[in-house]
Amino acid sequence: MRFINIKTIHISFAGLLAISLMTSVASASYKQWPMVSKGEVRYLKMIKVYDISLFSPTKITADNVLNTNVSKCLKVDYAVDLTVDKFRLATNKILQRQHSPDYLKSIQQPLETLQSAYKPVKKGDTYNVCYNGSNQFIRLELNDKKLVEIKSAELAKAYLGIWLSKNKPISRPLYNSLFKNK
C-alpha cells in the first residue's frame, strides 16, 4: 500500500494551478480588455461586409499597434456569408500589396497553418484574431471557439497589419476610423 504525502498533494495542486493560470494568460480574451475603437468594412461603399472592433489592455496608437509586445484583439462580426476561398484570396492579396516576396516567404509556414484553419462564415458569425504580446501567440477563433494558436510575432504583425498597418490597409476608411484621435 502506497501512502501519499500531503506535501506531494500540495505541490501537485500548486503545479496544476500554475499551469491553469498560464493557460488563461496565454489565451487572454478580448472580453477582458477595453474596446479601443471600432469601424466597418463595406464593399463598393454600399454593402457592409463586417463590423470590426479593436481591443487591448494597453493604450493603442497608430504608431504602436503593431509592436510585437502589444497585446490586441480584433473582433470581426460578419454581415455576409464568405467562403474559405474568399478569405484566402483577400488575405493573400492584401499581404502581397503590403509586403515584399522575401518577407512573405519568411512567414509562409505559419501563414499556411493559420489559413488552413479558416472556416466559412455565415451572416452573424464572429472571427476573433487575438495576439498576446507576452507569449507571442496569435489565436484565431470562430464564434468563440479556438481554431488555431501559433507562436509567431512576425505572423501576428503581418496578419493584424491587414487591418492595422499604415501601409495599404485593407480599407483606408476603416483604418482612419480605428485610429482617429489616436
Where are these regions (language model features)?
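Terminal leader/tail segments of proteins
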Residues: S27-K182
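N-terminal signal peptide c-region/cleavage motif recognized by signal peptidases
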Residues: T23-V25
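Bacterial N-terminal signal peptides that target proteins for export
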Residues: R2-A14
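Hydrophobic core
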Residues: L17-L21
